[in-house]
């Protein structure tokens, strides 16, 4: 049963035309794929009322099998010079959308259902909508935000690597899209309106005016260097804006063995590299040392370790001293947490202790 008038009160020419398209899809489904069509919904500008004379009809045509793709088509009506694309969607497509990998969820969430043939499919749609609502309220959404920003960084790197203005603009588009999605999901929201209303929806969020201004400047720029500069600014703002500080644990017995690992993995290799004047090996081992301490400090309240700020590629022996100084600082952290560093005079002392202790 069609209830198209539930959200369209005035029977205008466009409404009649849209109704004819929907009726045609239903009739064709009964003829060529009677078991395929599950339901039809309307979303986009026609559903929100944000239409103009060239607005087309966005439909959620939910199908149950590949036979349903017979309903898909694209066409242009010459009397109004409007193009239409009739897409078909499977439940798996909606399930993917419900994971919130992006914030363009209006098709899933806001489609006005005007025809239902399979009640089970409609019930599944409602469950997916509930899932999205819960997800956008959950802490899990912040993982999606990070994933989107990581994708934005990849596209930013592409923009720095490409020379052609057109390609840099395409890279910029991907950066902007990922960042906009990230900011919306961060606030537990999704885009309900079309592209032309993007800044209206962003204006409802507590972001700085500079955020939207940067996007406007990027899309209006003819200079690759300017685009890259603005993209960097946009990315840094978005990353800081969406940063979710989590409470860090106090150092505890969980860190037992980490000091010995830091010593074993890289300390003597840094010294060897210095003796051999091997700048590359020294660099890699110091970075690895810094990386492990950074990983620990991201989980535990042990302070910051900016070792590579002090790294000296010109005098490698300095790096041995730097390594030992930071090791000493970390040993104090372990001692304060009641962690005893395992040191033995020789291998026999180790074996004896190793075999005696459980």
Predicted segments with their positions:
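Conserved nucleotidyltransferase catalytic core and NTase-mimicking acidic/glycine-rich helix/loop elements
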Residues: 139-358
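Short N-terminal helix-initiation segments at or just after the protein's N-terminus
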Residues: 21-29, 114-122, 232-233
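Internal, well-ordered alpha/beta segment that forms a basic, Gly-enriched binding/recognition surface
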Residues: 89-154
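Helical scaffold of the NTase/Pol beta-like nucleotidyltransferase catalytic core
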Residues: 4-38, 336-358
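Generic hydrophobic, helix-prone segments enriched in Leu/Val/Ile
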Residues: 10, 15-23, 120-128, 238, ...
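Glycine-centered small-residue hotspots that permit tight backbone geometry or close packing
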Residues: 34, 123, 208-209
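Metal-dependent nucleotidyltransferase catalytic core
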Residues: 16-36, 41-55, 60-111, 304, ...
């Amino acid at each position: 049963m069609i209830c198209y008038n539930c959200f369209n009160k005035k029977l205008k020419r466009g409404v009649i035309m849209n109704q004819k398209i929907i009726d045609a899809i239903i009739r064709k489904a009964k003829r060529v794929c009677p078991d395929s069509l599950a339901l039809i919904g309307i979303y986009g500008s026609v559903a929100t009322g944000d239409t103009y004379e060239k607005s087309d009809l966005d439909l959620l045509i939910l199908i149950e099998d590949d036979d349903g793709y017979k309903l898909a088509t694209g066409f242009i009506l010459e009397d109004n010079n409007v193009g239409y694309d009739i897409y078909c969607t499977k439940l798996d497509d909606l399930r993917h959308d419900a994971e919130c990998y992006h914030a363009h969820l209006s098709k899933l969430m806001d489609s006005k259902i005007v025809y239902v043939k399979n009640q089970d499919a409609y019930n599944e749609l409602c469950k997916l909508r509930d899932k999205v609502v819960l997800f956008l309220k959950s802490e899990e959404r912040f993982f999606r935000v990070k994933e989107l920003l990581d994708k934005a960084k990849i596209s930013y790197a592409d923009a720095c690597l490409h020379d052609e203005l057109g390609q840099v603009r395409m890279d910029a588009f991907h950066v902007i899209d990922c960042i906009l999605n990230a900011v919306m999901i961060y606030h537990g929201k999704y885009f309900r309106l079309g592209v032309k209303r993007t800044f209206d929806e962003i204006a409802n969020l507590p972001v700085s005016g500079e955020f939207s201004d940067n996007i406007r400047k990027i899309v209006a720029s003819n200079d690759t260097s300017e685009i890259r500069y603005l993209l960097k600014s946009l990315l840094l703002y978005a990353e800081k804006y969406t940063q979710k500080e989590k409470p860090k644990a106090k150092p505890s017995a969980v860190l037992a063995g980490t000091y010995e690992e830091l010593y074993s993995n890289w300390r003597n290799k840094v010294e060897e590299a210095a003796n051999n004047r091997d700048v590359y090996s020294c660099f890699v081992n110091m970075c690895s040392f810094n990386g492990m301490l950074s990983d620990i400090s991201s989980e535990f309240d042990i302070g910051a370790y900016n070792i590579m700020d002090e790294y000296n590629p010109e005098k490698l022996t300095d790096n041995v001293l730097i390594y030992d100084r930071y090791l000493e600082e970390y040993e104090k952290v372990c001692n304060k947490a009641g962690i005893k560093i395992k040191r033995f005079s020789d291998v026999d002392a180790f074996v004896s202790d190793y075999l005696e202790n459980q």
